[in-house]
Amino acid sequence: MAFAKLSAFVLALGATVALGESPTHRCLNKRVTCATGQTTANEACCALFPILDDIQTNLFDGAQCGEEVHESLRLTFHDAIAFSPALTNAGQFGGGGADGSMIIFSDTEPNFHANLGIDEIVEAQKPFIARHNISAADFIQFAGAIGVSNCAGAPRLNFFLGRPDATQIPPDGLVPEPFDDVTKILSRMGDAGFSTVEVVWLLASHTIAAADHVDPSIPGTPFDSTPSTFDSQFFLETMLQGTAFPGTPGNQGEVESPLAGEMRLQSDFLLARDSRSACEWQSMVNNMPKIQNRFTQVMKKLSLLGHNQADLIDCSDVIPVPKTLTKAATFPAGKSQADVEIVCNAAATPFPALASDPGPVTAVPPVPPS
């Protein structure tokens, strides 16, 4: 396990506990001061702080919420979701969940169709794993949690240390595709242990996301108008009537979007309008406390696929605290309530009253490369 790999390094670290506390108080509030000066609840987590600094400086361009953050978050999902208890119960290998297989078997798994383009972040992360004594399985989830923390408005995600690396390649076909219908997506996600509402919660990740390969003529095309902030614009803008493609038409898994420069995945469009998921989708619009809470819950669940939490070490306090975001959701300039395609009319989840941004019609710029 990664904990075993790190243990020798951890034992070499200086650690102190505050003196003058009662035994009971110390048991409840024990903090360890690492050799690097930071404090944490568990000595084993001290080894993560140098890795954190390296990631922020050399992978995320000085703690930015940019392309490499988007891709690292995508990798957390693609690595973990290749997990099928149904296959396991049928006597086949169903994948190891969050086991680093995408990096361990980087000559094979990134070539699966659903993983198109993920080889770039895989290759970017490999040198960090090579120079730090951490498993690929842990690094993928650690980098994803750190990356999310760079985005204003995001929740502080959990991180658990100690995942062993994969020993087998998961079967192809376990990662949902943007051209899959809702029934297929919900079935696949259900096999992995996620309910319909949890699928919607996971898609909060698309508020800080962009596509390079759905339409290769326009790399870096974001899924909402604010790809560097973790907000509810994605859920709002996916409910707006599509009017045009940001690049070329006819790409598999893409439908018309409401804004120039914004991409809309077919799967997002369908989930926002399907009777099984539309009300939960609508409930996320302008509801940041809910988005933050639910995304934290579901990302924890994703990161533990294939593992028992009791076997891992909680190092969540190593993850930086994201900046807060106070701006409410608004219609992009040129859009209003008249552009919303409402499917859910449940009294419990009414569509909120929102203002429209002033100025000319919104055009969304691409996410610049790292």
Curated annotation (Swiss-Prot):
Its EC number is 1.11.1.16. One of its GO terms (biological process) is hydrogen peroxide catabolic process. Residues 21-31 form a propeptide. Binds 1 heme b (iron(II)-protoporphyrin IX) group per subunit. Binds 2 calcium ions per subunit. Keywords: Calcium, Disulfide bond, Glycoprotein, Heme, Hydrogen peroxide, Iron, Lignin degradation, Manganese, Metal-binding, Organic radical, Oxidoreductase, Peroxidase, Secreted, Signal, Zymogen. PANTHER family: CATALASE-PEROXIDASE, THYLAKOID LUMENAL 29 KDA PROTEIN, CHLOROPLASTIC-RELATED. This is Versatile peroxidase VPS1. It comes from Pleurotus eryngii (Boletus of the steppes). The lineage of its organism: Eukaryota, Fungi, Dikarya, Basidiomycota, Agaricomycotina.
